[in-house]
Regions:
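Glycine-rich flexible loops
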Residues: 2-446, 458
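Substrate-binding pocket helix/loop in short-chain dehydrogenase/reductase
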Residues: 537-538, 542-550, 658
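Active-site helix of classical SDR
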Residues: 561, 598-601, 606
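Alpha-helical segment proximal to the catalytic Tyr-Lys
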Residues: 566, 611-612, 686
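Residue(s) in the substrate-gating loop at a strand-loop-helix junction
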Residues: 582
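Short, small/polar-rich loop/turn modules that mediate ligand/substrate recognition or access, typified
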Residues: 614, 619, 688-690
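Short C-terminal tail/terminal secondary-structure segment
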Residues: 689-705
Length: 705
């Protein structure tokens, strides 16, 4: 029981104290209400739905009191929206656009006219749903895509069920593409049914309202609760969902094994036009659907709600693989599933050719977004991790809709032409064209060893800032977790994973690459940066010193590269391996026998790898730093003391000494090494392999000959 309201299927999150602090600020209450609604993915999807409020304001030119509508702007998300995510428009001007409306065939031209109705010039651009709110008189309005409501809206008998369930208190508007005309249809429905508390949109979603932010919030929850309770009762009455289980899901550990083994193969196939990032989901809802008797009937039908198929494509690809299939031979697996991808691309091309108009945009990437693996789970692939994850969330919503619709009646998807007209809508294309240009490393996954701090963290940060998903790893768990938190705050949780890894332990390395494949679908860039330094004379070196240096530097580089190469070969997309070596690989000096020779081993191993991996389009290059003076582990383990002793100076004098001995008289920072690594992978040196880039300020003895 919440404030007198009892809800079983939705979350009542309203906090009277927080709302009281916003008393008198209707726009602030709109943002608050929107965030509450967007926090529950059962109510609306990420980026989906919109809310509004109408308030009195003073016109800055006439000084007259006018009615202004604040509504979620284009491209926003209710759960995270702030005041800056709202558009503010004159209500009277919006409604007056009816006088210049030329009919449904011309409704797209109305969008440009919204700009002539803007009240706050600093507000967000209006969305296509703006007139849907403007033509309704209510002060506060919510438009959501709740799974339970869409289950009714997408069922064969949706209109009759709506009228019976709500006894006429919720209206019905048949499916129609969002836009100016749909706003007029909502007004017509309300005019014909005065006193209703909401309107169900066929195959789309729900409109509800109230005179205050709180009234609208509660009304919205109550209508959705009624839908959800009805759907649940019908599920219980009808027994088996999705026709019952066709096959049993593998145990969780086995599902994960199949997923991380298969993901790089799928990623390679999905990336035939541009590199894609993967996501894997195997929650109970997904498992029930992919393991069901009705999967083969329902999945090809596609989704109903526009927000769903805009994110997931017209339908998913279903893999014809046994849950426990042997996936160890990537070539055989690819040979088996490649025909399914070919058939999917042909299906998508036929869909495009059969539905396109003279002015339709060119066909987009024909590869699937959602891939269903019976017995295992669901993969999704998109241009970045967030988009891939959200696509999975949207398809899970679609599963919920299909489950509910099948329980109460029969699920119906949108006709192909209607779906196409949404997907290739010129307004949708214009929105895509306005999106920022992809960064150089967008769609790439980079693993940087020793990235809890120092050079490794700087490299990972540079890659993340250029659009890559990054896998941080370090043997120091505390340092790694601190780096993960820092990266998550700066770049978002989706684009970073932190995995503890010991580069000297093959099982630890393999496990890290498996986790990376599960998280992102595979790997594109590996930077072997993990290292230590020990400075002693030959006489003072111990066998343990020698073994430790060679294990971490030479063996570690080999083990990580070997595991990464296996993943890259599965993908068939090439790749980059960058080895952080050292000036000391090429320059002899005192008290440096073990470290310098281990670095030399790294350097020659790099050349050998480059010679071998060329046919796989895997490039191997080296960056040779020297005397990185900031936040580097090179100063631990007695290295600084050893080098200072060798040069006859104090530790405090080392930075200046190192800078002065360079030709450029410059100190070297971790960011300098990061920039050098980016130079190899940023797109300008795609035909370079086996090369060495010195980042040492200019040390003549280290010039390569």
């Amino acid at each position: 029981m919440a404030n007198g309201h009892s809800f079983k299927h939705v979350s009542y999150l309203w906090d009277d104290e927080k709302a009281a602090a916003l008393h008198g600020d209707e726009v602030g209450l709109l943002v608050y209400r929107s965030n509450l609604l967007g926090a529950d993915l059962r109510l609306t999807n990420y980026g989906g739905g919109n809310t509004s409020c109408k308030v009195k304001a003073v016109d800055p030119i006439s000084a007259n009191e006018v009615e202004v509508m604040w509504v979620k702007g284009s491209g926003g998300d209710l759960g995270t929206m702030k005041r800056s995510g709202l558009a503010a428009l004159y209500v009277e001007r919006l409604r007056s656009l009816v006088s210049v409306y030329r009919g449904k065939a011309f409704e797209d031209e109305m969008v440009q006219l919204f700009n002539h109705c803007i009240y706050d010039l600093d507000s967000k651009a209006p969305s296509i749903d703006t007139p849907l709110h403007a033509f309704l008189p209510f002060k506060h309005i919510d438009h959501l895509h709740p799974d339970a409501a869409i289950a009714i809206a997408a069922s064969k008998d949706g209109e009759a069920i709506t009228r019976e369930l709500f006894k006429g208190s919720v209206g019905w508007v048949p499916w129609q593409r969002p836009g100016f005309d749909l706003g007029l249809q909502l007004k017509k429905c309300l005019d014909e049914n005065p006193g209703i508390r909401g309107i169900m949109l066929g195959s789309h979603g729900l409109f509800t309202w109230g005179n205050t932010a709180y009234e609208s919030y509660v009304n919205t929850l109550e209508v959705i609760e009624t839908c959800a309770e009805f759907v649940e009762q019908m599920k219980e009455a009808n027994g088996l969902e999705f026709g019952g289980e066709k096959l049993a899901a593998l145990p969780e550990a086995d599902r994960r094994r199949q997923a991380y083994t298969l993901a790089p193969v799928l990623r390679g196939l999905c990336s035939s036009q541009q590199p894609m990032i993967g996501h894997f989901s195997d929650d109970a809802r997904v498992r029930q659907f992919v393991n069901s008797q009705d999967l083969e009937r329902l999945a090809p039908m596609g989704t109903s709600c526009p927000d769903h198929f805009l994110r997931t494509k017209i339908s998913p690809l279903m893999l014809d693989l046994a849950p426990d299939a042997d996936l160890s031979n990537a070539e055989e697996v690819q040979e088996k599933i490649a025909p399914s991808f070919k058939a999917y691309r042909e299906m998508y091309a036929a869909y495009y050719e059969g539905c396109k108009h003279e002015n339709s945009p060119p066909m987009r990437d024909p590869n699937p977004v959602v891939i269903l693996y019976p017995g295992v789970g669901m993969f999704s692939f998109a241009k970045d991790k967030q988009t891939a994850r959200v696509a999975a969330e949207f398809y899970t919503n679609a599963i919920n809709v299909m489950r509910g619709a099948e329980a109460i009646s029969a699920y119906t998807s949108l006709p192909r032409q209607e779906a196409f007209d949404i997907e290739y809508w010129l307004l949708e294309e214009a929105k895509l064209q306005r999106m920022p240009k992809p960064k150089p490393l967008s769609g790439k996954v980079a693993l940087v060893t020793g990235s809890g701090g120092g050079i490794g963290k700087a490299i990972a940060k540079k890659f993340a800032s250029e659009g890559a998903c990054v896998v941080l790893n370090d043997v120091n768990g505390d340092r790694l977790r601190a780096a993960e938190q820092e990266f998550s705050l700066q770049f978002g949780c989706d684009s970073v994973r932190a995995i503890e890894m010991d580069v000297t332990d093959s099982s630890s390395v393999i496990r890290a690459l498996e986790e990376a494949s599960l998280a992102f679908g595979g790997i594109d860039i590996v930077v072997n940066n993990a290292g230590i330094s020990i400075s002693k004379s030959i006489g003072d070196h111990t066998e343990d010193d020698w073994d430790r240096l060679y294990d971490i530097l030479a063996k570690g580089q080999f083990l990580v590269s070997q595991a990464a190469i296996a993943v890259m070969r599965k993908q068939g997309m090439g790749g980059d391996i960058i080895n952080i070596v050292s000036k000391n690989a090429f320059v002899a000096g005192p008290n440096n026998a073990a470290y310098g020779s281990a670095k030399a081993a790294q350097a020659h191993l790099s050349r050998l790898m480059a010679a071998e991996l060329g046919p796989d389009k895997i490039r191997v290059n080296m960056v040779n730093p020297d005397a990185v003076i900031s936040d580097s582990n090179i100063w631990s383990g007695g290295w600084a003391e050893g080098r200072a002793k060798a040069y006859g100076i104090t530790v405090e004098e080392l930075p200046a000494y190192y800078a002065k001995r360079t030709l450029l008289n410059e100190s070297i920072l971790p960011e300098d090494i990061a920039n050098a690594c980016f130079a190899f992978v940023g797109g300008l040196l795609q035909k370079s392999t086996g090369n060495t880039l010195n980042v040492d300020g200019g040390v003549a003895a280290a010039f390569l000959r």
